[in-house]
């Protein structure tokens, strides 16, 4: 009996068409309907299509950077300082930074400003005759000398050389010759004579030795034959050679008498005895 009642009860009736049933939650139904109407796949296809369609347009329009053409016509007015013209006002404004000495800013000078212009050749021809009339004779002579110097061609100036009279070696200065003359300590009468040569490199780069072999020069260097030290000039070598000469001449100087120094007691005694001997010998 209970089982028959359960089958006859309409509350347990299952509908065959769920679409006809009303949804108890209207918000859920609106969300489901909106999700079915706007699918994310369609949005992706639209965005891809729009990007693909816009890409050839962007590729067809490359970025254009304008570069200044030096051969382009100058459309601006000239610079008030140097007179140069430019192809754009922006270039002219940038160029005005090269003139920081001007008294104003910008490209427009003050209304009372006058640009100093150089005098033309015609104006100079008109001014010079009037100026010449005020010149004195000395000014004329100085001006003529300056004109001769400016118009004259540079003459081939001869180089003065100094030759040693003993070994006929030629040097370019008095100092070098003086150092070389010191090497001729045993040669007397070594004097310098001026010799003018056209080739300045004939002697300065020569290498060899003099007739006594005292000084050896290799590629412009002077070598001492005693201690074999090398010097860059003959003057330096001559000053160095004096050290060896003073050492050699010391014993000779010690044995000689110096008249500027008073004699000692021992010297007086020897001189007296020597005088007596001389008198005795003369008497005999």
Swiss-Prot record:
Low complexity: compositionally biased ranges: 47-62
Keywords associated with the record: Metal-binding, Nucleus, Repeat, Transcription, Transcription regulation, Zinc, Zinc-finger
Coiled-coil segments: none
Entry comment describing in which tissues the protein is expressed: Expressed exclusively in pollen.
Inducing factors: Activated by the transcription factor DUO1.
InterPro entries xrefs: Znf_C2H2_sf, Znf_C2H2_type
Compositional bias per record (Basic and acidic residues), positions renumbered to this chain: 1-12
Zinc finger (C2H2-type): 77-99, 162-184, 222-244
MF terms (GO), sorted A to Z: DNA-binding transcription factor activity; zinc ion binding
PROSITE patterns linked: ZINC_FINGER_C2H2_1, ZINC_FINGER_C2H2_2
Pfam families from the UniProt entry: zf-C2H2_6 (PF13912)
Biased composition, class Polar residues, residue ranges: 18-37
GO biological process: pollen sperm cell differentiation; regulation of DNA-templated transcription
Localization, UniProt: Nucleus
Any single Gene Ontology cellular-component annotation: nucleus
Location of the region described as Disordered in the Swiss-Prot/TrEMBL record: 1-76
Subunit structure: Interacts (via the EAR motif) with TPL.
Role, per record: Mediates the regulation of male germ cell division by DUO1.
PANTHER family cross-referenced by the UniProt entry: ZINC FINGER PROTEIN ZAT2-RELATED
This protein's name: Zinc finger protein ZAT3
Gene: ZAT3
């Amino acid at each position: 009996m209970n089982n028959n009642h359960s089958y006859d009860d309409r509350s347990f009736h299952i509908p065959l068409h769920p679409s006809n049933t009303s949804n108890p939650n209207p918000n859920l139904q609106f969300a489901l309907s909106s999700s079915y109407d706007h699918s994310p796949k369609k949005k992706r296809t639209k965005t891809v299509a729009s990007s693909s369609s816009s890409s050839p347009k962007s590729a067809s329009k490359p970025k254009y950077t304008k570069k200044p053409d030096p051969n382009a016509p100058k459309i601006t007015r000239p610079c008030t300082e140097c007179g140069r013209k430019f192809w754009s006002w922006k270039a002219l404004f940038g160029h005005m930074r090269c003139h920081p000495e001007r008294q104003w800013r910008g490209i427009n000078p003050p209304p009372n400003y006058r640009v100093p212009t150089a005098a033309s050749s015609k104006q100079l021809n008109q001014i010079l005759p009037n100026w010449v009339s005020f010149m004195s004779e000395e000014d004329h002579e100085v001006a003529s000398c300056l004109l001769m110097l400016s118009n004259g061609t540079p003459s081939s100036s001869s180089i003065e050389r100094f030759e040693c009279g003993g070994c006929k070696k030629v040097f370019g200065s008095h100092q070098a010759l003086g150092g070389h003359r010191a090497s001729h300590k045993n040669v007397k009468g070594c004097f310098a004579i001026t010799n003018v040569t056209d080739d300045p490199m004939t002697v300065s780069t020569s290498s060899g030795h003099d007739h006594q072999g005292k000084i050896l020069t290799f590629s412009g260097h002077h070598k001492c034959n005693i201690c074999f030290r090398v010097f860059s000039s003959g003057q330096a070598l001559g000053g160095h050679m004096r050290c060896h000469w003073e050492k050699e001449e010391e014993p000779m100087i010690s044995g000689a008498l110096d008249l500027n120094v008073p004699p000692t007691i021992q010297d007086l005694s020897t001189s007296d005895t020597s005088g007596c001997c001389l008198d005795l010998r003369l008497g005999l």
